[in-house]
Amino acid sequence: MGEFYHELTLSPSSYLELFSDFLLEATGEGIEEEGNSIIVRSDQDLSWLIEALQEFCQTLSARVSEEVNFSHSLTWKRNEDWIERYRQSIQPIECAPFYVRPSWHPPKPDLIDLLIDPALAFGSGHHGTTNGCLACLGALELEGKRVLDVGCGSGILAIASAKKGAIVEMCDTDELAVGEALKNASLNQVIASKVWIGSVGDAEGEYDLIIANILAAILIMLSPWLKERLKPGARLILSGILGPYKEDVLRKFGGFTLEKELLCEEWVTLQLRKN
């Protein structure tokens, strides 16, 4: 980054995590969450984002049937090592029995260490959907189980499963995500038995557990393959579901028993068992 940079501070009225996801995907820049605000910094002019955010608000408002808006400020600042400030803003997260941390923080005794350095658009454990999935994984016996992480992103959920003794596979339709997941697996000294660019439709055989932390619409679209690839009695962890869409997702899994439902921020995580 040069001597000066552009900084956008955004304060949504609600759905902070959705705005964060949108900004990550739209800009490819690292973001910082500070209270109820999101900060984006870039060498490039960010003024174009305002119109894009207004369109995003309209779409989101229609989907959730409530008014969503935001306030913002856009400034041009002298570079004062914001990267170091960003690093300091990323704090470890304890989601027992897991401890998610960046490399510049030490591990915590007696917890399963998940070493994830935040990347541009891949989960580092700070998202409500990731927390929900980790909470489910933490309570399951996974030793020797065959586990698939669909839409793996950073690979954090596959890595967590492997550290509990599972034989893991992971996939993502984004080639960059697969590369990031492999890097994080290596960082954690974890080996995935199979990794591919694609989705559950490309999987082979049956699994004891499938984790899919994506979005409700995609979970619905993938439901035939998710059901097909699970052994009888196997479990399915689904997340990325906003509350209003929970029933739509559950209807696609009528032959499953709902074992657990968690709400973290605006996000629902479901743990199901195949009958």
Curated annotation (Swiss-Prot):
Any Pfam family hit: PrmA
EC category name: transferase
Protein's UniProt keywords contain Protein biosynthesis: no
Subcellular location: Cytoplasm
InterPro entries noted in UniProt: Ribosomal_L11_MeTrfase_PrmA, Ribosomal_PrmA_MeTrfase, SAM-dependent_MTases_sf
Positions annotated to bind S-adenosyl-L-methionine: T130, G151, D172, N213
GO cellular component: cytoplasm
Enzyme Commission identifier(s): 2.1.1.-
Main location: cytoplasm
Domain of life, source organism: Bacteria
Record-level Gene Ontology MF annotations: protein-lysine N-methyltransferase activity
A biological-process GO annotation: methylation
Catalytic reaction(s) noted: L-lysyl-[protein] + 3 S-adenosyl-L-methionine = N(6),N(6),N(6)-trimethyl-L-lysyl-[protein] + 3 S-adenosyl-L-homocysteine + 3 H(+)
Keyword set, alphabetical order: Cytoplasm, Methyltransferase, S-adenosyl-L-methionine, Transferase
Functional summary from the UniProt entry: Methylates ribosomal protein L11.
Family classification: Belongs to the methyltransferase superfamily. PrmA family.
Name of the protein described by the UniProt record: Ribosomal protein L11 methyltransferase
Protein's organism: Wolinella succinogenes (strain ATCC 29543 / DSM 1740 / CCUG 13145 / JCM 31913 / LMG 7466 / NCTC 11488 / FDC 602W)
Lineage: Bacteria, Pseudomonadati, Campylobacterota, Epsilonproteobacteria, Campylobacterales
Gene giving rise to this polypeptide: prmA
